[in-house]
Amino acid sequence: MKKWTKKLLEESGYEIKNAQIESVRLTMADHGVLTSDLVLNGHGWGVCYGGYVLGKGYLGSKDFEGYGSGMEAIMRIMDTVGVEEYGQMKGKYVRIATKGLGSSVRIIGNILDDKWFDYESFFADKKDEENDNGM
């Protein structure tokens, strides 16, 4: 996973904004896949952070499949936010890195520490590891 710092993000054209986590959701509703979503509220804007597939299954399914990388992603997000329990993220403040209106938010940061989690590079690295291991 790319090791971001605030300085590197800004040098790469990202704008850093503060946001509050309004809600947290771990759901398999509507998609047949498990996703983790954080609804973020900034000053005059909002965004849902997440949407990556962490497992497959739906209510009443006979087969469920969870991904280790999905669990690791959730744990890394919790570590970045600074909580030990998933539900404790609600109400916490974070920073996001954005390239502006219409761009996806894939990088979230701790409100005080220079600690960041990048969904896109995390899952790209996991995919590369699987390919290297012949999976």
Q: What do these predicted ranges mean?
A:
Residues M1-M135:
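Short beta-rich binding modules
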